[in-house]
Amino acid sequence: MAACCSSLATAVSSSSAKPLAGIPPAAPHSLSLPRAPAARPLRLSASSSRSARASSFVARAGGVDDAPLVGNKAPDFDAEAVFDQEFINVKLSDYIGKKYVILFFYPLDFTFVCPTEITAFSDRYDEFEKLNTEILGVSIDSVFSHLAWVQTDRKSGGLGDLKYPLISDVTKSISKSFGVLIPDQGIALRGLFIIDKEGVIQHSTINNLAIGRSVDETMRTLQALQYVQDNPDEVCPAGWKPGDKSMKPDPKGSKEYFAAI
């Protein structure tokens, strides 16, 4: 299973890494709704060394060199998803010209860190909606697994009702096209992409398996992106939030900014 309670892992690393121990295969495809499986703790063999334990949540994605870069068009996809306890289809390009998109990947359903992120985004969904932004979650699990997880109470490790779709990437093609797939494990790293209304990736961040993402920072980055797109002659300095002073990206403008802070 995907990691949650372990020593901190680094962000995507160029060094080779050991596979994540104890992750079972994704929920099997079935026409009948599966019962939510009980979460099993990650176990390492007694012979594992201290260094092996420390690196057990460090994984490396394949195809990173081919991953979509900030400033390029996001790879399109058309996939099945679960929303409002129904099966729907989601096509990324349908949002072009209409909405910003927060697209985030997570390793597996019925795990540990993942539900904390997924429910946190759902709890803040109305704030993103006011910024004309849709949220899309993606994992390699089937829609049946997604549905079972949504139908499981939060107090039991489930998600409860969500305000945005969970996309099924059983072919792993979406994860691969965004450069977050870990080939030898068949799951995705915690990648997050902010895509503007033109379908262009404006921000990306990829955490390793043990590190959850911040909804607050995602919101702040989205607000900064929208500000500079509305004010193309200005830039946002470090930690900028709505109401803070921005900067003109020229010698005179920068001097005015630094003199004012």
Swiss-Prot record:
Keywords: Antioxidant, Chloroplast, Disulfide bond, Hydrogen peroxide, Oxidoreductase, Peroxidase, Plastid, Redox-active center, Transit peptide. PROSITE patterns: THIOREDOXIN_2 (PS51352). GO terms for biological process: cell redox homeostasis; hydrogen peroxide catabolic process; response to oxidative stress. It catalyses: a hydroperoxide + [thioredoxin]-dithiol = an alcohol + [thioredoxin]-disulfide + H2O. InterPro entries: AhpC/TSA (IPR000866), Peroxiredoxin (IPR050217), Peroxiredoxin_C (IPR019479), Thioredoxin-like_sf (IPR036249), Thioredoxin_domain (IPR013766). Gene3D superfamilies: Glutaredoxin. CDD domains: PRX_Typ2cys. Its main location: plastid. Residues 68-227 form the Thioredoxin domain. Pfam families: 1-cysPrx_C, AhpC-TSA. Its EC number is 1.11.1.24. GO terms for molecular function: peroxiredoxin activity; thioredoxin peroxidase activity. Changing residue 114 to S: Loss of activity. The active site is at 114 (cysteine sulfenic acid (-soh) intermediate). Transmembrane segments: none annotated. Residues 1-60 form a transit peptide. GO terms for cellular component: chloroplast. It is found in: Plastid, Chloroplast. The keyword Transmembrane does not apply. Homodimer; disulfide-linked, upon oxidation. Interacts with the plastidial NADPH-dependent thioredoxin reductase NTRC. The active site is a conserved redox-active cysteine residue, the peroxidatic cysteine (C(P)), which makes the nucleophilic attack on the peroxide substrate. The peroxide oxidizes the C(P)-SH to cysteine sulfenic acid (C(P)-SOH), which then reacts with another cysteine residue, the resolving cysteine (C(R)), to form a disulfide bridge. The disulfide is subsequently reduced by an appropriate electron donor to complete the catalytic cycle. In this typical 2-Cys peroxiredoxin, C(R) is provided by the other dimeric subunit to form an intersubunit disulfide. Belongs to the peroxiredoxin family. AhpC/Prx1 subfamily. Thiol-specific peroxidase that catalyzes the reduction of hydrogen peroxide and organic hydroperoxides to water and alcohols, respectively. Plays a role in cell protection against oxidative stress by detoxifying peroxides. May be an antioxidant enzyme particularly in the developing shoot and photosynthesizing leaf. This is 2-Cys peroxiredoxin BAS1, chloroplastic. It comes from Oryza sativa subsp. japonica. The lineage of its organism: Eukaryota, Viridiplantae, Streptophyta, Embryophyta, Tracheophyta. The gene is BAS1.
